[in-house]
A protein has these predicted regions:
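N-terminal intrinsically disordered, low-complexity, charge/repeat-rich segments that act as generic
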Residues: 1-49
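Non-DNA-binding regulatory cores of transcription-related proteins
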Residues: 54-110, 116
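Short, intrinsically disordered low-complexity segments
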Residues: 29-31, 59, 113, 120
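Short, solvent-exposed secondary-structure boundary/capping segments
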Residues: 120-127
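Peptidyl-prolyl cis-trans isomerase
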Residues: 45-56, 120
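A short, hydrophobic/aromatic-rich structural module that often spans a beta strand
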Residues: 111-112, 125
């Protein structure tokens, strides 16, 4: 049984313009579907274990000893773009959850080990 994804109204408002229109690549379609089915809550009500925009997360790929630190960002912000296959897979995921990241030629699972920084948890709503 899967639970309904939870995202902030602020993230929803900022992402909607990015995924509306005629884009048909997989990450955009994935985000569009997530925005359509997610429960949208005010930023202070977002659970602290949900990957939101501008979160810093530590992820691990199966079979690898080292984890990787990533910051989920809007395009052109210098981090992992939410419009990339991995960024779209991580947005809305929960700590401890494994998600499928599907790129042009490869598909692999990645696990969110922990959320090191989440703006909502820190009450940073002006991001």
């Amino acid at each position: 049984m899967t639970t309904q994804p939870i995202i902030s109204t602020l993230d929803s408002e900022r992402l909607e313009p990015l995924v509306s229109g005629s884009w048909t690549d997989a990450p955009v379609l994935r985000l569009r579907a997530l925005l359509g089915r997610a429960s949208k809550v005010a930023p202070p009500q977002v659970p602290s274990d949900v990957v939101t925009m501008n979160s810093r997360v530590r992820v691990r790929y199966p079979g690898e000893n080292e984890s990787e630190a990533l910051e989920l960002t809007f395009p052109d912000a210098g981090g992992l773009s939410v419009l990339s296959p991995l960024g779209a897979a991580l947005f809305g995921a929960r700590e401890g959850e494994s998600v499928e990241c599907t790129g042009a030629r490869v598909s692999r699972r990645v696990t969110v080990e922990r959320i090191e920084y989440q703006p909502e948890r820190e009450r940073h709503f002006d991001r």
